[in-house]
Amino acid sequence: MKKITKRILGGLGITLGSVVAIIVGYVGYVLIQYNRIEDNLILDVHKNSNLDLDANKVFTISTYNIGFGAYRPNYSFFMDEGYMADGTKVVGKSGKAELKESVIEATEGVIKEIQELDVDFAFYQEVDTNSTRSHHVNQNEMICDAFSHYDNVHAINYHSAYLLYPFSDPIGKSNSGLTTLSKYKIKEAIRKSYPISSGFDKFFDLDRCFSVSRISVNNNQDLVLVNSHMSAYDEGGKIRAKQIEVMKSFFDEEVNKGNYVIFGGDFNHDLLKDNPKFQYEEGKEPEWMHFTQLKPDWLASIDYEKDLTENMQVAVSDNAPTCRDADLPLIGYENDLYKSVIDGFIVSNNIEVVDVINIDNGFEYSDHQPVILRFSLGEGN
């Protein structure tokens, strides 16, 4: 009996030791794989345009978080958490896109949408190049090939080790970033790092950044295009607050040079809630704001007194939401899911905003919808 007990205990010890060794080995692998991309990294500009920018016209620019081609109407994401009206907590399920064919179809859809709008400039976020989660579809290549007469820049903001969570559908290894397109010649581009968490969660989060593309204007100033994707899940919004400060400093520095600045993308901040231009009497709010879910914990709001300087103006619309919560699929929960406007543009005060519109496509290709800004350039300093 004692021998049997010893064998059982010995077997359990070996099994437990093996499990511990695997866990330690995996943690070591994640730690070794982690590195932050250097700040102020010079980016390659793929030059296809021969057009110079004349200040005396109206331009259009789009921004679109394409969600790595995964967020079709039947998709929910494992990191998204929300609460129903009765307080019931709901959590998304998936880490990867369902099928490679679905990623290709979604990517083709977001390309076609922007092509039909014939914009002068375009920002895309969550553009995968070689990721497990998007079945290794090179979305950046697809986008740039479709806009072959545009200059293009790609800045990496997610380069992870193979992540084993969620265990039911591991997200795997990721390579993803921000893609910027311009009909006009981009003279140079740079990647600037955002502050991120210094805790253990940094090993699983994006390497947050914004890409800066400079275009010469015929009045001896620069049009500075900034493609940005701020943090989403930092508790208490402390990291996002630091990122806002970086944005403010960048604006002041560029505007003081007399340059025009368009800072666009996914701010992961509600751009309407405290906006003085969009305060509604009870019952007068847009129809799309009628949903049953409670505001998610991750959603912060832009503070229009603290987060902006005199050099900045928010270009945003309330005609449609730009983001839906992904803690549940859209199908079956269209009237329940929390929706918001977190995508748009903040521009320098020497830019005239002609109009802004959120394109309502029913969240067909992503958990975000595109935003279009028409603008003109005023006199530089």
Question: What is the predicted role of each segment?
Answer:
Residues I66-G69, V127-S131, N157-A161, I186-K187, ...:
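Solvent-exposed loop/turn segments at secondary-structure junctions
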Residues R72-F77, H136-V137, L164-S168, S193, ...:
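Short aromatic-enriched loop/helix-cap "lid" or pocket-rim segments at secondary-structure transitions
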